[in-house]
Amino acid sequence: MKIREATEQDFERIWPIFREIVAAGETYAYARDTTKEQALRIWIEVPRKTFVVEEAGNTLGTYYIKTNQQGPGDHVCNCGYMVSSTARGRGLATAMCEHSQDVAKKLGYKAMQFNFVAATNDGAVRLWNSLGFVTVGCLPKAFNHPSKGFVDALVMYKWLET
């Protein structure tokens, strides 16, 4: 398994992962019918950097890193992670989150924040907690889950400096 920086050409292999996860509507606050062009902007063009996880020529996962706020908040980054349904349970999200923290430090970020974690995404919440993230806020009924209705969204944060 290899994590490397993505190029725009990688988007053809990222798109099926993005489409599957976003269309499910269970974890990301993107429109379930997000177009390929919109997804390219969200995942490749806007972020500071995007990465892919590859194995035997297959793209198994991806993440982006970007500045969360401008000005006085520009020392805090935000990341988004996606793992192909065929590769879940293999530690890719852990590997990507650990990799992203190293990248964040190299880019000069002091902290990482996840802005809108669906509280029903138990696996992600457990993983982020195990990697040192704390829930610093709860947005009541802010996420409209397709089968569970309005559920809480969490703001999770980790100071990266030791």
Predicted regions and their residues:
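Helix-loop element at the rim of GNAT/NAT acetyltransferase active sites that forms part
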Residues: W15-D33
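Conserved catalytic-core motifs of GNAT/GCN5-like acyltransferases
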Residues: Q113-V117, N129-V151
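Glycine-rich acetyl-CoA-binding "A-motif" of GNAT/NAT acetyltransferases
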Residues: N58-G61, G123, F150
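Conserved GNAT acetyl-CoA-binding A-motif
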Residues: A104-F116
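Short hydrophobic/aromatic beta-strand or adjacent loop that forms the aromatic wall/cage
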Residues: R48, V151-V155
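Conserved acetyl-CoA-binding loop-helix of GNAT-fold acetyltransferases
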Residues: G89-A104, V125-S130
